[in-house]
Amino acid sequence: MVLLFWISKQKAGEPMSERKTQQELDFERKHEEDLQRIRDFRLIDDDFMAAVFEDHDCAEFLLRIILKRDDLVVREVRGQYSIKNLQGRSVRLDILAVDRNNRAYNIEVQRSDRGASEKRARYNSSLLDANLTDSGEEYDALNETYVIFITENDILRAGLPIYHIDRTVQETGMIFNDQAHIIYVNSQIKDETALGKLMHDFFCTDSRKMYYPILANRVWYFKENEKGVATMCRAMEKMRDETAAEQNIKTLLVSVKNLMKNMNLSPEQAMDAMGISEDDRKMLLQRI
């Protein structure tokens, strides 16, 4: 009787050896969600944009169109590049490129207006100055820099496809040639110009609908090629881990500050009481 009951249960479901654990089911669900996200990615999405334009030729192509300079040659390019601010905390840039004349380009895509404010542009410009020169170098050694925001909305609200910002002398109108440039690209304008077609491509989820083959091929690689898809999946897993780690630090920071306030402790004493690891201590001390 027991044997018949066991056999009937086995027929009703999968063999025990083939049943999946909850962990395996969760992994498959998460993987399928990642694949769907990859299918929906566009170049206006910063993580995907960073992966595509980390390619040397794609970055060079992008800059040539935005700056209207066919002579521009990129020497090196990095995606999701971390640099330090004055407090020693890491700030991640979508793209950092340097050309053969040592000009530096920070390219950011921003879907929210707040992330592309005027002071954010100034902040990024200062980060480039602080990180691209060695200690003790003369100010004349500063790189010429470009901070380029590609924005989902028309941040400056003048209906133009592109805005160039340079310091000027108010009394004369002359350019103050500090060689620190800021550019806003309005992705709302998708006309038949080279820049308009580029902005069209920034909103395509399907590489077959893109104007520029050099970008379409790179988008296809990350969406359709097995190796490219695997690369994006690993990148997304890394982002999840980093997000979880950042949330953990924020939670610890609140607890440490509360303990310091309520018990009148120093940061070190509060972290000792909480048994915080050495790695987490270093990160917390930068923020307290």
Regions picked out by a protein language model, each given a short descriptive name:
Residues 169-178, 183-188, 198, 202-205:
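Low-complexity, glycine/alanine/valine/leucine- and proline-rich hydrophobic stretches
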Residues 2-178, 191-193:
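Accessory alpha/beta interaction modules
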Residues 2-39, 43, 47, 98-100, ...:
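Short, charged alpha-helical interaction segments and adjacent helix-coil junctions
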Residues 149-152, 186-187, 223:
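Pocket-edge structural micro-motifs
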